[in-house]
Amino acid sequence: MKKLSKVFSAFVKKPLTSETLESALNELNLLLIGNDVATETADALCEKIKESLKGEQIGRLTSKSKFLFEILRDIITEILTPERTIDLLEEIRIKNKSNNPYIICFLGVNGTGKTTTIAKIAYYLKKNNISSVAAASDTFRAAAIEQLSYHMQNIGIRVIKHEYKSDPASVAYDAVQHAKAKNINVVLVDTAGRQVSNKNLMREMQKIVRVSEPDLILFVGDSLAGNDALNQAKEFNNSVGIDAHILTKFDADAKGGAALSISYETKKPILFVGIGQGYDDLEPFDNAIFISNILDLKEE
């Protein structure tokens, strides 16, 4: 977050005139891209600033930095505002009224902290008196089944699992049936995390989604991965569909560009951010706090 804050701060303090605006925006664009903001997002942000300043006599503004700050805040708020907002606990309670479990499917590549994030969500639900069961539908790696079982055992959540290399969709199906039989509120479906270019993986994901009929498909992305995280989100969104995001390692992200890019490119909300290794190190993503952190600007 600190690096984006410095980028915006430097832009606001520039001696801008109508003549120098174009070169200042080009410089801002390059700095944004250098701080993990995707090219399309950086282009859009700069274009929106240009549109907002059209017709303004920049040099005559009595408080230029305040004016630019307000423009930036409005533009970034717009970028971070999703097509629809999701109140997870409320959605779960509404679905449970029909005596059916709420089903969450987790997508993401290996190494992003997906399995730990599933455990964090299970722990979060437990704290809110919502029961859950996990489906070990990453049958591609035996270690994935063991890892999920380890985390869920730590927080007292049952895992439905089959043999290594068994059909992932059938594991998800069995977990849903178990939840219905035992009146469990939520089913958490883990999935394989191979590279997104793997067509077999995408077919597997599509089958899991067809069989389990999730109410929510969550993409788990590593906020330190920058454009890689964005490309993964786009691939999953195009092939399977994504409803919302969770960004891991958010506490270590000095740049802050991934959140901005993923929000702009997918138009889906960021529900939570991971801020540590503990099961309670998960926070709801707060747009206002994020904007405040990346626009840590001082008025002239």
Regions found by a protein language model. Give the residues of each.
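Short, cationic motifs built from Arg/Lys/His that form the positively charged side of catalytic pockets
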Residues: 141, 154, 191-194, 210, ...
